[in-house]
Amino acid sequence: MAQEIVWYGAGAGAFFVSAVVFVWFAATRGNIRSSFYYLPPIHTSVAGAAYVAMALIAGGQLGDTVSITTLRFADWIVSTPIITYYLARLAGVDTQTRRLAVAANVVMIGVGYGFVSMSGSLRWIAFAVSTVAFIGLLYLYIKTFARKINAATASVRSLFQSLRDLTVVTWSLYPVVYFLGPLGTGIIQAPDLNFLVAVLDTIAKVGFMSILLVRYNSVETFVDSWSVAPAK
């Protein structure tokens, strides 16, 4: 349990530090009124708050009021659609497509919670439905978004591809980890699953922020050309 407290605490620290750095970046070099700038620190702050609560639960300070798993999925159902919406905005897709992508994301997480909270055949039905929603989301990322962003500048396309590829790779590992975990085949035990999920969360979210900060030229191009006039 002490190890889990360290993992959750380290994750929370990484999320909050990345949020603060990005807010500073937005205040000094960007436009905090643009969704391009205010969404990234929101999504890592949500994750940071969830990880603080997880650390407190693991340490016994919050008792059994809520489970770590419930907190984790509550974080994901808020923070992951922000990433999806962000990628959709960056790609410049229309409003209907953005809503479809966000809806698929919410279904993926919401039904995925059924996998960890139900039992028997219902658990595997939930896993299958969540996986189908994820595959649909991947199609939007890889095909629909990619077709639309072909009209953007080379720097914006490169930025989108980096963020999308990071998201696709990390998110694809979550169902594998859960399938191999205690609720699936049992190859991965609960403490190891919690560690792996914490690592994936950190890579997915802090990595997303890091790419944005490093790729400042691409960010600047995007803000100048698209963020002031959102796609309709």
Swiss-Prot record:
- GO BP term, pick one: phototransduction
Give membrane topology per the record. Answer: Multi-pass membrane protein
Superkingdom, taxonomy of origin: Archaea
Per UniProt, subcellular location reads as: Membrane
Q: What induces it?
A: Expressed constitutively throughout the growth phases, both in presence and absence of white light.
The record ties this protein, via Pfam families, to: Bac_rhodopsin
Residues at the site labelled Primary proton acceptor: D75
Q: Which molecular-function annotation in GO is an example for this chain?
A: photoreceptor activity
Record-level GO cellular component terms: membrane
Instruction: Report the Gene3D superfamilies cross-referenced here.
Output: Rhodopsin 7-helix transmembrane proteins
According to its UniProt record, which protein family does this protein belong to?
Belongs to the archaeal/bacterial/fungal opsin family.
- Relate the protein's function as given in its record: Sensory rhodopsin. Associates with an unusual transducer lacking a methyl-accepting transducer domain found in all other photosensory transducers. The chromophore is all-trans-retinal in the dark.
- Write the protein's name: Sensory rhodopsin III
Source species of the chain = Haloarcula marismortui (strain ATCC 43049 / DSM 3752 / JCM 8966 / VKM B-1809)
Q: What is the lineage of its organism?
A: Archaea, Methanobacteriati, Methanobacteriota, Stenosarchaea group, Halobacteria
